[in-house]
UniProtKB/Swiss-Prot annotation:
Keyword line: Cytoplasm, Hydrolase, Nucleotide metabolism
EC annotation from Swiss-Prot or TrEMBL: 3.6.1.9
Family, as annotated: Belongs to the Maf family.
PANTHER family for this protein: BIFUNCTIONAL DTTP/UTP PYROPHOSPHATASE/METHYLTRANSFERASE PROTEIN-RELATED (PTHR43213), BIFUNCTIONAL DTTP_UTP PYROPHOSPHATASE_METHYLTRANSFERASE PROTEIN-RELATED (PTHR43213:SF5)
InterPro entries: ITPase-like_fam, Maf-like
Taxonomic lineage from the root: Bacteria, Bacillati, Actinomycetota, Actinomycetes, Mycobacteriales
Organism: Mycolicibacterium vanbaalenii (strain DSM 7251 / JCM 13017 / BCRC 16820 / KCTC 9966 / NRRL B-24157 / PYR-1)
Major localization class: cytoplasm
Name recorded for this polypeptide: Nucleoside triphosphate pyrophosphatase
């Protein structure tokens, strides 16, 4: 059976896959995102930035796979960032940065970009390298000052792309989205479906129920 490896520590991505019938092996990549971002061409389009980060994560994990997975598996790497007002925004990393981000994006709309990289590995060899970037437009509401304070104090927005989650407390402050909701959570099911088919597999080959 072809195993699925998720090259991410994201609980959101893991939840999306599990709800869709796939219980992946989770192996977190050792990629230093800040270092990689600093080395990228500053003129790269935002979609290419998240795609390169996703590919780096997938390749990093593929290089460390145990033999039982190298025999037959699919590795999925992802990276999400919010593109708003001409700027790519990743994880705030601190309460102060999360608050500043919410104060600037309240009442605005941006695009949640998720780069996807999918590696098909068979017999210890990478036979397919597929990738694409999903984009979903997110319209943010205008939370009150005390709501922003309590949201930041919850800790949720500090370590997630764009300082919000659609399927958590942050969902209260999203007015609407245009596009794929699973992409906002961090892994686009329709996009991964397309990538899997490019490798010659059917997504149903990967289901575990």
């Amino acid at each position: 059976m072809t195993r699925v490896v998720l090259a991410s520590a994201s609980k959101g991505r893991l939840g999306v896959l599990r709800q869709a019938g796939i219980d992946p092996q989770v192996i977190v990549s050792a990629v230093d995102e800040d270092t990689l971002l600093a080395a990228l061409d500053p003129d790269l389009p935002p979609e290419a930035v998240v795609a390169k980060l996703a590919t780096a994560k997938a390749l990093s994990v593929a290089a460390e796979l145990p033999d039982e997975l190298l025999a037959d598996c699919v590795v999925i790497g992802c990276d999400s960032m919010l593109f708003l007002d001409g700027t790519l925004r990743g994880k705030p990393g601190s309460a102060e940065a999360a608050r500043a981000q919410w104060e600037s994006m309240a009442g605005s709309a941006g695009h949640l970009l998720t780069g996807h990289a999918l590696l098909r590995i068979s017999g210890g060899v990478i036979t397919h390298t597929e990738g694409d970037t999903g984009s979903t437009k997110v319209h943010f509401g205008k939370p009150a000052e005390d709501e922003i304070t309590r949201y930041v104090d919850s800790g949720e927005p500090i370590h997630v792309a764009g300082a919000f989650t659609l399927n958590g407390l942050g969902g209260w402050f999203v007015d609407r989205i245009e596009g794929d909701p699973s992409n906002v959570i961090g892994l686009s099911l329709p996009l991964v479906h397309r990538l899997v088919r490019r490798t010659g597999l059917s997504i149903s080959d990967l289901w575990q129920r």
